[in-house]
Every structure is written in structure tokens, then in C-alpha cells.
Amino acid sequence: MGLIFFRYDRCYMLSVLSYLHVYFGPFRLLQSYAVLMGIALYAGFFFTYGVLPSAYRFLPQDRGRAFAPCAQEAAGKPTGAGVIFVSVFVLLVYLLMRPSFVHALILLLTWGVMLTGYLDDCAQVCWGEYRKGALDFLFAVLTAALLGHFYFHDQVFWWFPFFSDPVFVSPFLFFAGSVVILWMSINATNCTDGVDGLSGALVLMALLSMGTIFYFLLGNVRAAQYLLVPFVVDGAQWALMSFALAGALMGYVWRNAHPSTVLMGDAGSRALGFFIGVLVLISGNPFLLLMTSGVILVNGGTGLLKVVLLRFFHVRILSRVRFPLHDHMRENWHWSTAQVLLRFMILQGLLTIGLLGVLFKLR
């Protein structure tokens, strides 16, 4: 097994063509995960880019967020575009690979999270915070239990910087930690979806980062042995799924660039946050959430912490800071939409590169 090309053992629709390489040599490239990842990326982009405008008239209209700066800019635009690009993602995965039982479950759960968000986007009255939080918690609990039992078989090992050997994690601790990671990832990503292109661009960076890590590092035996990290047997398949969703998301971000013509809605943001959380759990290092989504967590997650402390413990923190943080930057620091987007992306890029070295080299 080489560093770049992986044998595509469980072939499916496109890879059937690879057997025709005796007649046309280039067909053998369809046995490579690298090629299939490229196909997933480009197919996801062009299909979403082409289909999305024709779906505008069928999508619900944004109601505008109460008390949010510039809410009038979003009001009336088609929203819930997540139903399009998440569905494209699921179809692409089934086209390019034969998902295992766990992969199929994750695809189903991702689509289910998207569906709950889409129903909220379509509702005449916005669902309450407790209702949405309870649904997110339910999906997090279900996913944590399924991964712990069917994927890790109740034998979970996490790897950390400064430790050369993986650390055994009890099933209860894995379950509790996974629920927190998934719930935070879903809601922090949802809170970040308030500036044209911001949430989509940051999640896109996270997906490409995770896909690259799964393919070149965790999913490669030699690289994993060298870095003293556990080898993920199906790492290339998780990488393909990451690139498929990244491609579909690119098609949406193209249309969501300022001034946007469509919004992803809860249908998109919640599903994206959920899938990022799943990738982090599969990787075996919860700190990868900081590496790939650190800006998302600070931008949206800190606001969630502020609300929880105030509402349930009557503890007030950061009272002079508006959350999500991008609202504070626009209202108090007078950043433009383009400045918020570019500066947040730069910060995330710096964070990703810095933590990549810390997590994988300081062993």
C-alpha cells in the first residue's frame, strides 16, 4: 500500500469500469482512491453549482434572525440549501464507494440531522431553542452509542500530543465525550452561519483538512507508524466522504458569496457540524476539532457557553462582547462582510497549520 494510491477493493458503480483497463489503460485509475476523491470533489461542485439555482423557487424563504445585525439582508432569500448539497453528498458516496454498515449509518444520520434543520427552515414559526437542542442531543447520543459499539467495538483508544502510546478510553467516557463534541460541533457551526460565505468557507477548510489527514496520515500504514498514531483501516474511505461533501459544499459557497443569492439554513449548518464531529471522533483525537474548527468554536461555541452559564447558573461572562463573535466584529469593530470572512479564514489557516505540527509531531 503506497502513500498516494490505495487499492480500491470494495468497488462499486464507477470502479466497475476499472476492469476495462485491458481495453483502455486509463480505466485502471478508477481503482485509486486519489482519483475517486478528485472525481467526488469536482462532481460535487459542478452538480451542486448547476442544480442549486433551479431549486430556489422550491426552497423556503429566510425569516431573518431576530436581534441580528443586517438581518434584513438575509430576509426573503431562499434558504435551506443544505437539503440540496447534503443530498448530493450522500448520492456521490453511494456512487463512488460501497459504504460499510457504519458508513451507511453515518450517511443516514447526517441526512437526518439535515432533515430536522430543513423542517425548521420550512416552519412558519421558528422552532424553539430547547426543541432544537433536544434533537441535536438525541442525534449526538445515538451517534456516540453506534460508533462506540459498531465501529470501535467498545475498545476505544485516543491519541494525544506528548504521549507516544494511545490511551485507552472507557466506553462511558467515550460516550460522554462524543456527545459533547457532536453537540458542540452542530451548534457552533449553526451559530457561525450568519455572514455570507463564512460558515461554508470555514467548514470547507475543515473538510479538506480532515480528508487530507485521513488519506495521507491516519489512513496510511507507514505514515501512521512513523507518527506513532493509530492506523485507521478505512481512512481512505472517510477521506473520500470528506472530499465528496467538500465538493458539494463548494457549489453552495459559490452561490453564497457576498452578496449571496441563497442560504444553507439549519439544514446545511447542522448537518455540516454533525459530520465534522463524526470525523473528529473517527480520528481518535478530540483535539482535531480545535485544529479544524477552532474559529467556529470560538465564534459560535463561546456564545453557547455564555448563554448556558447565564441561563442555568446565573453566571455572567463577557457581558460586553456580542455573540456570535462575527456580529461583534461587524457592529463594534466595524468590519465589513469581506473583512470578517477573510480574517476568520486566515485565523483558521494559522490555527490549522500550528496545531497540525503540535498534534502529530510532539509525540
Curated annotation (Swiss-Prot):
It catalyses: UDP-N-acetyl-alpha-D-muramoyl-L-alanyl-gamma-D-glutamyl-meso-2,6-diaminopimeloyl-D-alanyl-D-alanine + di-trans,octa-cis-undecaprenyl phosphate = di-trans,octa-cis-undecaprenyl diphospho-N-acetyl-alpha-D-muramoyl-L-alanyl-D-glutamyl-meso-2,6-diaminopimeloyl-D-alanyl-D-alanine + UMP. Its cofactor is Mg(2+). It comes from the Bacteria. InterPro entries: Glycosyl_transferase_4, PNAcMuramoyl-5peptid_Trfase, PNAcMuramoyl-5peptid_Trfase_CS. One of its GO terms (biological process) is cell wall organization. Keywords: Cell cycle, Cell division, Cell inner membrane, Cell membrane, Cell shape, Cell wall biogenesis/degradation, Magnesium, Membrane, Metal-binding, Peptidoglycan synthesis, Transferase, Transmembrane, Transmembrane helix. GO terms for cellular component: plasma membrane. It is found in: Cell inner membrane. It is an enzyme of class 2 (transferase). Pathway: Cell wall biogenesis; peptidoglycan biosynthesis. GO terms for molecular function: metal ion binding; phospho-N-acetylmuramoyl-pentapeptide-transferase activity; UDP-N-acetylmuramoyl-L-alanyl-D-glutamyl-meso-2,6-diaminopimelyl-D-alanyl-D-alanine:undecaprenyl-phosphate transferase activity. It is a multi-pass membrane protein. Its EC number is 2.7.8.13. The chain crosses the membrane at residues 33-53, 82-102, 105-125, 133-153, 166-186, 198-218, 227-247, 271-291, 295-315, 340-360. Belongs to the glycosyltransferase 4 family. MraY subfamily. Catalyzes the initial step of the lipid cycle reactions in the biosynthesis of the cell wall peptidoglycan: transfers peptidoglycan precursor phospho-MurNAc-pentapeptide from UDP-MurNAc-pentapeptide onto the lipid carrier undecaprenyl phosphate, yielding undecaprenyl-pyrophosphoryl-MurNAc-pentapeptide, known as lipid I. PANTHER family: PHOSPHO-N-ACETYLMURAMOYL-PENTAPEPTIDE-TRANSFERASE, PHOSPHO-N-ACETYLMURAMOYL-PENTAPEPTIDE-TRANSFERASE HOMOLOG. This is Phospho-N-acetylmuramoyl-pentapeptide-transferase. It comes from Treponema pallidum (strain Nichols). The lineage of its organism: Bacteria, Pseudomonadati, Spirochaetota, Spirochaetia, Spirochaetales.
